[in-house]
Every structure is written in C-alpha cells, then in structure tokens.
Amino acid sequence: RFFGWERQPGKDTIQGKLEAVLGELQGAPVNVIGAGRTDAGVHARAMTANVVLDTALTPEEIRDYMNRYLPDAIAVREVKEAAPRFHARYNALGKTYRYTCHVGAVKPVFDRKYVTLLDYEPDVERMRLAAAYLLGEQDFASFCGNPRMKKSTVRMVDHIGIEQRRDRVIFTFHGTGFLQNMVRILVGTLLEVGRGYWEPEYVQEILLAKDRKRAGPTAPPEGLCLMKVDY
C-alpha cells in the first residue's frame, strides 16, 4: 500500500501523507520526524513521530483532524505535547519488533498482508538455541542490509522470543536499535536453522565473519511489525 515511511517524490509514503495533512492544518510545509524508517511492506502499530506546529487546537483535536483526512490505512492513536528538544529518533531508548510467520497449506486470507507464508514447519527449539548466540552487545555487520554502512554496526539485542501458536511462528525482538533490514535478516537466518540447513552454533560463525553473505536471506517485509518504541 505504501512505499515505506520516508517521503519519496511521486510515491505514497507514511511520512508524506502525514506531512500533507499537517501541512494543510498548518497552512505551511511541516517536517514530520519518525522514530525509524520502515521499509515498504513493513507495518507499525506504534510508530512515534514529532512535528512542530503553531496551532490553537488541542492534542485531541489535532488527532481527530488527522484521522479525518488520512487514508484509512493510517491511524493516529494519540497526540501529546512534547518537550521542545524532543526527537522521536534520537531520544528513543529501545524498540520492539514482531515478525509473524504462517505455517500450513491453507492461506490466511484475512491476514495475508501481515504474515510471511512458510511451506515447512521450522523447529522452534533449534531456533531458540541459535537465538541465544545473538543476545548482548555485538557487531551485527553480517546482519546489516546496507553494504555501504560507515557508522558502527555494534548493537545491543537483549531479548529474542520465539513461540509457536497453532499455525503461527512468532518472533519478538527488543534492542536499543537495529541496523537496516537487521530484524528481517535475523529472522531469515533463524529460519535456515529451523529448517535444518544450519546448526544453531553456526550463528556464532556468522557473527564473527562480519560478512552479510554468510547470513541467511532477508525475510519478506510483510511479517514484520514495529510494536513499541521506548523513551
């Protein structure tokens, strides 16, 4: 439906739609700053953003105005007055992502845009063993989708949960921050372990290699959702 968060000329993006509506409210262009840049196909239940507005409307009235004019696929849950120096991206202390896979021959018609389809049943216990090697502050260069990344690729991941609920395998990640496509590459790698292609211990070698080619594929965007941003 949208080409990700970040505004792009001639394309529908979340940032672009928010700025268009708020620009009409303000009567002048505005700059909406998000907590991150979700890719096309990725979802968010709790994206946080900040914007400077000069208006007499209350936060509730701003929320209602936005929800009246935004596309049906975008909803503003809450508007709050922030501190003058608040920055949705740089002030974030942590993020929680969820990745959902559907296992089975019957397609999930109503949820098809929010899950990734698997034609095999991954071994959850094997994936949990592999995930244990990914916890802590480590160099995740092998799990970075940007080959020209010049900044530090060291990140802290303090929780990886993997559970099976009937026909769903659900991954939950929490960390202080994530590299481009990092969560999707982590999922793609864990699924390779879950289907028996790699042993759980091989994840250690992938980390030490600091080479994107050693990790698994980038999992499709549909199953990924930003669940929470900590401040």
Predicted segments, located by residue:
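Structured-RNA-binding interfaces characteristic of tRNA pseudouridine synthases
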Residues: 1-231
